[in-house]
């Protein structure tokens, strides 16, 4: 099945500490034919300054098509900022590309974005959630992001993940816990509405 990557962007993108950020790493190992980039206002400003994200993608995969969603979101730490726009954006991609599998980057963006996208990946047909741990296997907090003044071409030249034999860090986490709680809540709602037969059918 053909693939499309839906990816928010964060401080680890496109490269951090001489290794791929999550977006680039998924692109490298899953080779989707198209990438849909979701920008907050902060990431949009960085892209407009030097096109760091799109340049890095074109450098790694010259034939990969790029779509961009500029959300204008400033308060990226608020769930309500993403609760509507992210599901709508993913659904739009699914509707426009019914023959494609949608890969969802669960490792870039704010914790709020990651949670919303993980729930979507768990509960949406033809969607696959992918995580990319840091190369050290630890939190990225101690590794400062590259300065905005550093040319992305220089970062790409010293990218360890571009070397032959570099480790594939992509993981497909079990998201059944999200699906379990969603189904549980549906069953409870049906019981409260006295729809016992429907609740029993769903439980089975």
Pin down the residues of each PLM region.
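Long, low-complexity, Lys/Arg-enriched
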Residues: 1-103, 112-204
């Amino acid at each position: 099945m053909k693939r499309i990557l839906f990816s928010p962007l964060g401080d680890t993108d496109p490269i951090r500490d001489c290794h791929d950020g999550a977006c680039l790493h998924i692109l490298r190992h899953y080779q989707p034919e198209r990438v849909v980039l979701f920008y907050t206002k902060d990431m949009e400003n960085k892209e407009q300054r030097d096109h760091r994200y799109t340049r890095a993608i074109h450098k790694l995969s010259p034939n990969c098509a790029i779509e961009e969603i500029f959300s204008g979101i400033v308060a990226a730490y608020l769930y309500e900022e993403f609760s509507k726009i992210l599901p709508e954006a993913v659904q739009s991609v699914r509707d426009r590309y019914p023959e494609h599998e949608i890969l969802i980057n669960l490792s870039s963006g704010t914790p709020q974005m990651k949670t919303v996208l993980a729930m979507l990946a768990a509960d949406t047909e033809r969607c696959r959630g992918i995580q990319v741990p840091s190369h050290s296997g630890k939190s990225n907090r101690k590794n400062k992001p590259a300065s905005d003044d550093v040319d992305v071409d220089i970062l790409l030249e010293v990218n360890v993940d571009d070397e032959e034999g570099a480790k594939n860090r992509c993981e497909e986490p079990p998201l059944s816990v999200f699906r379990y709680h969603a189904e549980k809540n549906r069953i409870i709602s049906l019981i409260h509405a006295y729809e016992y037969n429907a609740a029993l059918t769903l439980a089975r």
